[in-house]
Amino acid sequence: MAKKKALVPFFYLTSIVFLPWLISLCCNKSLKTWITNWWNTRQCETFLNDIQEKSVLEKFIQLEELFQLDEMIKEYPETDLHQFRLGIHKETIQFIKIHNEYRIHTILHFSTNLISFVILSGYSFLGKEKLFILNSWVQEFLYNLSDTIKAFSILLLTDLCIGFHSPHGWELMIGYIYKDFGFAHYEQILSGLVSTFPVILDTIFKYWIFRYLNRVSPSLVVIYHAIND
């Protein structure tokens, strides 16, 4: 009986890990058809942000240049104008289809992430007791580690998050999150977040060492600085 109770938090932790994937799979299957029909039948107003408007305008400028070229070649009767105009018409229709698919993809991913957040928040709130048990296990495990291993682990974690090569990892992670929410890629926003996040984390970490570790385990701070130097 005690063994079963001990396994309950592990099952709960496993469910938290796989629940977002399951929610995403179910929402993508159930919501995609509904959102597609809603978008196509309601002809809803587009809610483009500045970045997406810029992308759309660039596409329309390209089409406008094609139309200007169409006007220019009217001077040459031997050119097959009908085929050329037909090609422009097909490109315009294709662009509209791609734009609609992109908008549907954005709404679908944003809705899925919002639903996942709400469900996981409620699931975590209902399982507070299990989370408390897991937290106590983690604290006990960390407490039993030697100061050398703790210092090495902290150093490894900080190098991964705020080290010399960390910006590339942050760029990949933030870019993935940005894409997962369906937002258009914007280099200036991405580079701004990548350059800001490590600095904020570095400040928080130094404050944590100064206020918490110096009080709880001064020997750990000494070992950490010795390894870091």
Swiss-Prot record:
One of its GO terms (molecular function) is antiporter activity. Keywords: Antiport, Chloroplast, Hydrogen ion transport, Ion transport, Membrane, Plastid, Plastid inner membrane, Potassium, Potassium transport, Transmembrane, Transmembrane helix, Transport. Coiled coil: none annotated. Pfam families: CemA (PF03040). The keyword Transmembrane applies. The chain crosses the membrane at residues 6-26, 107-127, 189-209. The keyword Chloroplast applies. It catalyses: K(+)(in) + H(+)(out) = K(+)(out) + H(+)(in). InterPro entries: CemA. GO terms for cellular component: chloroplast inner membrane. Its main location: plastid. One of its GO terms (biological process) is potassium ion transport. It is found in: Plastid, Chloroplast inner membrane. It is a multi-pass membrane protein. Contributes to K(+)/H(+) antiport activity by supporting proton efflux to control proton extrusion and homeostasis in chloroplasts in a light-dependent manner to modulate photosynthesis. Prevents excessive induction of non-photochemical quenching (NPQ) under continuous-light conditions. Indirectly promotes efficient inorganic carbon uptake into chloroplasts. Belongs to the CemA family. This is Potassium/proton antiporter CemA.
